[in-house]
Amino acid sequence: MCAVFEVPRSNYYAHCLRAERVDEQRLLLRKRVNELFVQSRSSAGSRSICDMMWQQHGIAIGRFKVTRLMEESGLVSKQPGKHAYKQATVERPDIPNMLNREFAVSAPNQVWCGDITYLWAQGRWCYLAAVLDLYTRRVVGWALSEHPDADLVTKALDMAFEQRSRPEGVMFHSDQGSQYGSRRFRQRLWRYRMQQSMSRRGNCWDNAPMERLFRSLKTEWVPSVGYMTRREAMQDVSYYLMERYNWVRPHQFNDGLAPAVAEEKLKTVSGIS
């Protein structure tokens, strides 16, 4: 055969040896990619896996190579479906939109955002309220309840206030949900010396960071069939918000760093306490 194609036998044998040789480094990379993909509950794409490979394993790898490794393993990231935004029916001219989409802030505890979403647990809808610090998009408070009332959003605010060591002068921004315009919630803001801001009616982009948080939670983490019990929902949501989202999941806003990691890094660089 070699004589027919005028190929030296040494070249043929060298080719056979290369074909039999196992690329151990590639196998290791594929294993790491699989592990990170499984940890993300099949939600991480090539960009997120690149960031996590560097942050967790110190491995610098390009998106193209990660994409190839994912294809070799048959890994396909979840694709989010169409997102339906709720709309308020009554305008609140007494609470202006003071944030006005100025989502980039210069320090922690300058602006917090809040919103409510729903989850299926124990055969019924439960409601999740969360509070996000806009500085690095870190979740600082949350609460879960069977009722989407003022008590729910107040509990999430209380948690954030204690978690962040009782800061003063925070601007709290939300949509025009009745819970955030309630007497109970507004009194709590007054007690905490916080300034209130509300989105314009029916404009989801005025509170876009919260919409993105809930979109990530539902498309990446929450089981498609919901939770068997409310306790299971509490534990799983708590882990995602306070551990995975804050400390592990790469965020594009922070150049691939998780929100809490980015905050600690920025505090060190700027000297913010």
Model regions and ranges:
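RNase H-like polynucleotidyl transferase catalytic core
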Residues: 1, 79-84, 144, 172-176, ...
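Mobile genetic element proteins and their domesticated derivatives, centered on retroelements
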Residues: 1-5, 12, 33, 49, ...
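Basic, flexible linker segments flanking DNA-binding modules
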Residues: 2, 9-107, 203, 258-267
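Conserved, non-catalytic sequence blocks in retroelement Pol enzymes and Pol-derived host proteins
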Residues: 21-22, 39-42, 56-59, 103-105, ...
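RNase H-like two-metal-ion nuclease catalytic core shared by retroviral integrases
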Residues: 88-90, 174-176, 180-185, 198-218, ...
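An active-site-proximal beta-strand-loop segment
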Residues: 101, 105-140, 146-147
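Active-site beta-loop-alpha junctions of metal-dependent nucleic acid enzymes
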Residues: 124, 143-165, 171, 181
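C-terminal domain-tail junction helix/linker
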Residues: 190-194, 216-273
